[in-house]
């Protein structure tokens, strides 16, 4: 009986961190560019990461749903939500997200480290009618606001793109740019 209790206790001690949610907060102490504060919450049980960028009216939040392969970003200034497929070759896995953020923060690299990977998306001007196909997390975040689908532009560069883009930079790991008419207004 004592063995069972000890075993259950040890199992709980070692299993709890693997299934728990964790939060990572990164403050931009040198807030010259007005990047504000970012926080990442990861729910390993549901395979979802939530990134919040708090910078006044230029704030946004993003959900990366690793379970269904979609991500959504809600742009508060534009009052829109943009959904796109996750490029798993560029975006960090949910397992490595914690390690990447801690490495950047603890080593003090921040914006001075290696350049972030970049993704560029073209936003379809037609509104999405059915949010349920993207999963309940994305549907809940985007419910009640205009939502658009975006397609990744392969081999694209902001340097050569002449249209208007809105760029979200996630913890110096990945820059995601949304380009098209819906981000101009």
UniProtKB/Swiss-Prot annotation:
Keywords: Disulfide bond, Golgi apparatus, Mitogen, Secreted, Signal. InterPro entries: BRICHOS_dom (IPR007084), Gastrokine (IPR051772). GO terms for cellular component: extracellular region; extracellular space; Golgi apparatus; secretory granule. SMART domains: BRICHOS. Residues 1-20 form the signal peptide. Residues 54-150 form the BRICHOS domain. Disulfide bonds join 81-142. It is found in: Secreted; Cytoplasmic granule; Golgi apparatus. Its main location: secreted. Expressed in stomach (at protein level). No expression is detected in cancer tissue or gastric cancer cell lines. GO terms for molecular function: growth factor activity. GO terms for biological process: digestion; positive regulation of cell division; positive regulation of cell population proliferation; regulation of cell population proliferation. Belongs to the gastrokine family. Has mitogenic activity and may be involved in maintaining the integrity of the gastric mucosal epithelium. This is Gastrokine-1. It comes from Homo sapiens (Human). The gene is GKN1.
């Amino acid at each position: 009986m004592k063995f069972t209790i000890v075993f259950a206790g040890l199992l709980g001690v070692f299993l709890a961190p693997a299934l728990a949610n964790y939060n990572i907060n990164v403050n931009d102490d040198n807030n010259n560019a007005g990047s504000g504060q970012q926080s990442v919450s990861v729910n390993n049980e549901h395979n979802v990461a939530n990134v919040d960028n708090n910078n006044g009216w230029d704030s946004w939040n993003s959900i990366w749903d690793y379970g269904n392969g979609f991500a959504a970003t809600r742009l508060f200034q534009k009052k829109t939500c943009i959904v796109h497929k996750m490029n798993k070759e560029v975006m960090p896995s949910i397992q490595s997200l914690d390690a990447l953020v801690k490495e950047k923060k603890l080593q003090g690299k921040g914006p001075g480290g290696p350049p972030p990977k970049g993704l560029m998306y073209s936003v379809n001007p037609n509104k999405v009618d059915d949010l349920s196909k993207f999963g309940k997390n994305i549907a809940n975040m985007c419910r009640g606001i205009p939502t658009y689908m975006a397609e990744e532009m392969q081999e694209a560069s902001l340097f050569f793109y002449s249209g208007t883009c809105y760029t979200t930079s996630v913890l110096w790991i990945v820059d995601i740019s949304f380009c098209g008419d819906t981000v101009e207004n």
